[in-house]
Amino acid sequence: MQRNSLIGDTIRSLGFLSRLPLPQRWFEDGDDSLPRNARAFPLAGAVLGLLAGAVLFMAYKVNLPPLACAMLAIGALAAMTGALHEDGLGDTADGFFGASSPDRRLDIMKDSRIGTFAALTLIVFVGLKAALLMTIIDRAGAGYAALALVGCEAASRSGMLAFWHALPSARPGGLSDSVGQPQWETVVCGFGIGLAFLVFTLIPAGGFLSLINALVLATGLLFGFARLCIAKIGGQTGDTLGAAQQIGSVAVLAGLVMAL
């Protein structure tokens, strides 16, 4: 099988986005350009969501309460990704609201220490995601909650791709600047994959309204966040990409809950 196939791009995307053990041969001869491989970010997200959904479903089957099932799934996602996106969300919150100048905000975002804004933001997002998953379990069942995790993890990385493409780099020499930006064709491919996952994971539980809700919420929130990034630091960084993924994930789950 060709290393530059969509499967190869998915495995290399998983290598960047997660800590899952992966066959080394896929990283030897293929195109290791992250902006090109990024077309498979939604597929990598779907794999992570599938594994987290399996944790949620199995926890429910051994009679754990919905909140415990949701928290275990969230913990599984964080463990698989090394809390990559949560770290970006926390750093973004500390930087944006802990300083008054763009340069100082960027300096704070590079600091590995967690501040008050980061801690509060992570508590809110983890709590909100757990509450949404718990509600889906209560209203539609654990199977649909597991499916929703697949959809939200895939689609949120489609949103992250669009966010990455649309905004200029705010930190010369930073991660997102050093690897470049995805081309429009990559974004379109990633969006199509993410949309397909939304159709097949949300509509069975919440109908077309859940799909519309998810798209409207995610688009609106990411657009607002993009404007905030421009105002605060003049563009995007690796941290804000992680924050965009977290925002998109919560938006998709909220869209489904609103339709149930």
Curated annotation (Swiss-Prot):
Cell location: Cell inner membrane
Enzyme kind, highest EC tier: transferase
GO CC, any one term: plasma membrane
Claim: Transport is one of the keywords in the record: no
Cofactor field: Mg(2+)
Membrane topology summary: Multi-pass membrane protein
Keyword Cell wall biogenesis/degradation: no
Pathway assigned in UniProt: Cofactor biosynthesis; adenosylcobalamin biosynthesis; adenosylcobalamin from cob(II)yrinate a,c-diamide: step 7/7
Pfam families xrefs: CobS (PF02654)
Main location: membrane
GO biological-process terms attached to the record: cobalamin biosynthetic process
Membrane spanning residue stretches: 40-60, 64-84, 117-137, 192-212, 214-234, 240-260
Gene Ontology terms for molecular function: adenosylcobinamide-GDP ribazoletransferase activity; cobalamin 5'-phosphate synthase activity
Reaction(s) the record says it catalyses: alpha-ribazole + adenosylcob(III)inamide-GDP = adenosylcob(III)alamin + GMP + H(+); alpha-ribazole 5'-phosphate + adenosylcob(III)inamide-GDP = adenosylcob(III)alamin 5'-phosphate + GMP + H(+)
EC number: 2.7.8.26
NCBIfam families membership: cobS, PRK00235.1-2
Family label: Belongs to the CobS family.
HAMAP family named in the record: CobS
Protein task: Joins adenosylcobinamide-GDP and alpha-ribazole to generate adenosylcobalamin (Ado-cobalamin). Also synthesizes adenosylcobalamin 5'-phosphate from adenosylcobinamide-GDP and alpha-ribazole 5'-phosphate.
Protein name per the record: Adenosylcobinamide-GDP ribazoletransferase
Species in which this protein is naturally found: Brucella anthropi (strain ATCC 49188 / DSM 6882 / CCUG 24695 / JCM 21032 / LMG 3331 / NBRC 15819 / NCTC 12168 / Alc 37)
